Swiss-Prot record:
Name of the molecule in the record: Argininosuccinate synthase
InterPro entries given in the database record: Arginosuc_syn_C, Arginosuc_syn_N, Arginosuc_synth, Arginosuc_synth_CS, Arginosuc_synth_type_1_subfam, AS_cat/multimer_dom_body, Rossmann-like_a/b/a_fold
Organism phylogeny: Bacteria, Pseudomonadati, Pseudomonadota, Gammaproteobacteria, Pseudomonadales
Keyword Phosphoprotein: no
Binding residues annotated for L-aspartate, in chain numbering: 120, 124-125
Gene: argG
Cellular localization per UniProt: Cytoplasm
Length: 405
């Protein structure tokens, strides 16, 4: 094997990464540093410390990255109203560049010459982790066990763990049949019955939300305060970025908001079905578009809408740390200087409805837009010349005999 002296492993403490830890020690005969990130996945991360210690790991990093995740990754993404393929709010994709960044930082701190991750050779995450790592540390070695070993089934992983004395839990019938990934922005479900695109997902699959049918019969109203494109307060109470998202997840989930069942196009070429719960993100997207509707110039808003699919694709395919994403981010952030104000929302049985928006930076002028007399604020006769000039090219073409019928 390649000459690797020390490797930083993205470690959850679960079966896969525990097997990877032992496999790295045996296969590469190297020292392993473990890194466990708390991104708000809702599971205790401290048990990973004891598991790593039991396997002889001396350098263990367990980092609470929730605030950084929302402040520096989720919020910047939502400033662009980012959606991949019309529906997916990129909950998994946006977490990977932060993990890659921290892996490289720890590698630099510990003198490690390699990093390792547990992403499979079929998915997008391998690309996201590694593109980020190479962008931040060009000479780093990346070890992806799923592309090297022959442990290609869960049963083989279990056998390997038992053979090498790795503590594992044999789950009974209550074990979820789905592959799940969670952070503060969302929780995803793949595999199991979802691999049949005609089979409806099971109701007990969902972890964060009630079904819209069982949501309260009374609507919930909330007000979100924006400053420079980011939410800074809920119902007038200022909160940190991570607290904002956590609270919106709780409120949205209680009202059956944020469920999604889609088939997406993976970067590696295949189609994949996934179900997602993104209650807070669903609310944030609706509210952000609402505050922009009164604060953004028309052409700026339209240009943002044109750029968004490219920006979304860059995040989905792992190019967060690319120069083109950084360039787009500067443009997006510049557009948010005047995106300030308050949005009022009605949450009811899976629906998010904007019922009010206001801002000191609003470009909406009721005196001009009114259907009543406007006191001369807008001269309707001016529209005739405007229409004639915009019709000029079409009239010329028609006069040349270029029929459209």
């Amino acid at each position: 094997m390649a000459d690797v002296k020390k490797v930083v492993l993205a470690y959850s403490g679960g079966l896969d990464t525990s097997v990877i830890l032992k496999w790295l020690q045996d296969t590469y005969n190297c020292e392993v540093v473990t890194f466990t990130a708390d991104l708000g996945q809702g599971e205790e991360v401290e048990p990973a410390r004891a598991k790593a210690q039991a396997m002889g790991v001396k350098e263990i990093y367990i980092d609470d990255l929730r605030e950084e995740f929302v402040r520096d990754f989720v919020f910047p993404m939502f400033r662009a109203n980012t959606v991949y393929e019309g529906e997916y709010l990129l909950g998994t994709s946006i977490a990977r560049p932060l993990i890659a960044k921290r892996l490289i930082e720890i590698a630099n701190e510990t003198g490690a010459d390699a990093i390792s991750h547990g992403a499979t050779g079929k998915g997008n995450d391998q690309v996201r982790f590694e593109l980020g790592a190479y962008a931040l540390k060009p000479g780093v070695k990346v070890i992806a066990p799923w592309r090297e070993w022959d442990l290609l089934s869960r049963e083989k992983l279990m056998d390997y763990a038992e053979k090498h004395g790795i503590p594992i839990e044999r789950h009974g019938k209550k074990k979820s049949p789905y592959s799940m990934d969670a952070n503060l922005l969302h929780i995803s479900y793949e595999g199991g019955v979802l691999e049949d695109t005609w089979t409806e997902h099971e109701e007990d699959m969902w972890r964060w939300s009630v079904s819209p049918e069982n949501a309260p019969d009374q609507a919930t109203y909330i007000e979100l305060t924006y400053r420079n494109g980011d939410i800074v307060a809920i119902d007038g109470v200022e909160k940190s970025p991570a607290t904002v998202l956590a609270d919106l997840n709780r409120i949205g989930g209680a009202n059956g908001i944020g469920r999604l069942d889609i088939v997406e196009n993976r970067y590696v070429g295949m189609k994949s079905r996934g179900c997602y719960e993104t209650p807070g993100g669903t609310i944030m997207l609706k509210a952000h578009r609402a505050i922009e509707s009164i604060t953004l110039d028309r052409e700026v808003a339209h240009l943002k809408d044109e750029l968004m699919p490219k920006y979304a694709s860059l995040i989905y395919t792992g190019y967060w740390w690319s120069p083109e994403r950084l360039m787009l981010q500067q443009m997006i952030d510049a557009s948010q200087v005047n995106v300030n104000g308050v949005v009022r929302l009605k949450l009811y049985k899976g629906n998010v409805t904007v019922v009010g928006r206001k801002s000191d930076d609003s470009l909406f002028d009721a005196n001009i837009a009114t259907f009543e007399e406007d006191g001369g604020a807008y001269n309707q006769a001016d529209a005739a010349g405007f229409i004639k000039l915009n019709a000029l090219r079409m009239r010329i073409a028609a006069n040349k005999g270029r029929s459209l019928l």
